[in-house]
Regions:
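Histone-fold recognition with a strong bias for associated Lys/Arg-rich disordered tails
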Residues: 1-175
C-alpha cells in the first residue's frame, strides 16, 4: 500500500526528528523528508522549485519552532494531527483513484500536503511558486511548469498580425 521509497522517507523523517529530540513530527518534517524522495523530488523539480532554498527554509523553521524534549532519555516523537491527516489523505486518494495504482508514493503525499492550507509547508511551497494544480498537472499529464508558461504565450504570428491590424482603419471607418 505504501511504496518502499515513501517508507524510507517517513522513516528518515522520524529518525531525524528523534535525533533532534523534537517532541512532534510535523508536516514540515514530512516535506523536508520528501525533498530526498525520488518521486516527490521529480515533481518539485518539474514545478521549478529551488530545492536547496526550500530545504534551508524548512530546516530553519523546524529548528526555530519545534519544541524539543530536555534530558538524555530516548524521545518518543509523536506525529501531529496535520501529519496524520496528510498521510491519511494520500492513502484515501490512491485507494479511491480508479487508475489501477495501488501504492502511495511521495508524489501523492506532496499533493496531500496542500490539504493542510494553514501549514507553513504549504506557505513555503507557495513562496516557491508551486500550487496544488502544478503538482497534479505534472503527476497526471506530465506537464512541467515551464511548459505551461510557454503554451500560454501567444504564437509569434498572432502578435504581428494584431499590430498590423491596428495600423489599418477599422471596419467602421472604412464604411
Amino acid at each position: 500500500m505504501i511504496a518502499q521509497e515513501l517508507e524510507v522517507s517517513l522513516h528518515m523523517a522520524f529518525v531525524e526528528a528523534r535525533q533532534a529530540r523534537h517532541e512532534f513530527i510535523t508536516v514540515e518534517h514530512l516535506l523536508l523528508a520528501l525533498l530526498d524522495n525520488p518521486s516527490a523530488a521529480e515533481v518539485l523539480r518539474a514545478c521549478a522549485v529551488n530545492v536547496d532554498d526550500l530545504r534551508k527554509t524548512l530546516t530553519n523553521f523546524i529548528t526555530d519552532n519545534t519544541p524539543t524534549v530536555p534530558g538524555t532519555s530516548e524521545v518518543d516523537t509523536q506525529p501531529t494531527l496535520g501529519f496524520q491527516r496528510v498521510i491519511q489523505r494520500a492513502i484515501m486518494h490512491v485507494q479511491s483513484a480508479s487508475n489501477g495504482k495501488k501504492e502511495v508514493t511521495g508524489a501523492n503525499v506532496l499533493v496531500a500536503i496542500f490539504g493542510e492550507k494553514d501549514s507553513h509547508a504549504v506557505y513555503y511551497l507557495h513562496q516557491q511558486g508551486v500550487t496544488r494544480l502544478d503538482v497534479v498537472n505534472f503527476i497526471s499529464h506530465g506537464v512541467r511548469k515551464d511548459q505551461q508558461s510557454e503554451s500560454q504565450k501567444a504564437p509569434d504570428g498572432v502578435e504581428e498580425s494584431t499590430a498590423e491590424g491596428q495600423q489599418k482603419e477599422s471596419a467602421l471607418d472604412q464604411f
